[in-house]
């Protein structure tokens, strides 16, 4: 499996979120094991979106430089860069930066269908049932051994990367509002493979 190029992510965030369905998330672990999952659920976030970490930042009208502090600044990185952060002090979440460099945007990978390296995933997660391994963003990060060390790394090169996969027809794709947010709930920016049992069980916001 070869990594998707940066050009795949150098596009509108909503397009990347939709097109990542069916692609593979791959981690070639230090142990020599390859962990692979088929992406079945994503969410999009952009700088004009109140649910985005970069929404509080502004630009200097003369220089165009981003003004403000906080982790949202990392969403202005080059497309294909990892944006990994911790929530509730417990769960790491994997996002990939989108849009041309200097424009904030990212896609959150919410769920994958595990395909390779299942025993390693079970060890990392401490659960046996395949359906419970990666059906949520915190779960998949734990199963794939993804933590803050991957923040700002390039997801267009090994060891952690996205690879081409199966295309998902539009009639197989469902959309909803995103999960776990209080702002921007009117945007149907969550995409998932309908009827796939590895999609996260949480309910959409709103």
Curated annotation (Swiss-Prot):
Keywords carried by this UniProt record: DNA damage, DNA repair, Hydrolase
Species this chain originates from = Salinibacter ruber (strain DSM 13855 / M31)
Q: Which GO terms describe its molecular function?
A: alkylbase DNA N-glycosylase activity; DNA binding
Q: Where is the secretion signal located?
A: none
Biological process GO terms, please? Answer: base-excision repair
What InterPro entries does the record tag this protein with? Answer: Formyl_transferase-like_C_sf, MPG, MPG_sf
Which of the seven top EC classes does this enzyme belong to? hydrolase
What protein name does the entry list?
Putative 3-methyladenine DNA glycosylase
Q: Which family does it belong to?
A: Belongs to the DNA glycosylase MPG family.
Q: What is its EC number?
A: 3.2.2.-
Q: Pfam families of this UniProt entry?
A: Pur_DNA_glyco (PF02245)
């Amino acid at each position: 499996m070869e990594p998707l190029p940066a050009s795949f992510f150098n596009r509108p965030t909503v397009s990347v979120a939709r097109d990542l369905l069916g692609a593979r998330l791959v981690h070639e672990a230090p142990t020599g094991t390859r962990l692979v999952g088929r992406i079945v659920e994503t969410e999009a976030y952009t700088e004009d979106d109140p649910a985005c970490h970069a929404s509080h930042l502004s630009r200097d009208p003369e220089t165009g430089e981003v003004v403000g502090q906080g982790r949202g600044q990392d969403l202005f990185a080059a497309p294909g860069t990892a944006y990994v952060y911790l929530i509730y002090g417990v769960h790491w979440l994997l996002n990939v930066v989108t849009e041309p460099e200097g424009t904030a945007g990212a896609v959150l990978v919410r769920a994958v269908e595990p395909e390779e390296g299942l025993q390693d995933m079970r060890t990392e997660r401490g659960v046996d049932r395949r359906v419970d391994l990666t059906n949520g963003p915190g779960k998949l990060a734990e199963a794939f051994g993804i933590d803050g060390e991957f923040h700002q790394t390039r997801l267009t090169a090994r060891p952690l990367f996205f690879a081409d996969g199966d295309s998902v027809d539009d009639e197989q794709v469902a959309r909803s509002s995103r999960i776990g947010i209080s702002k921007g709930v009117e945007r149907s920016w969550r995409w998932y493979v309908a009827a796939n049992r590895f999609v996260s069980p949480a309910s959409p916001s709103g």
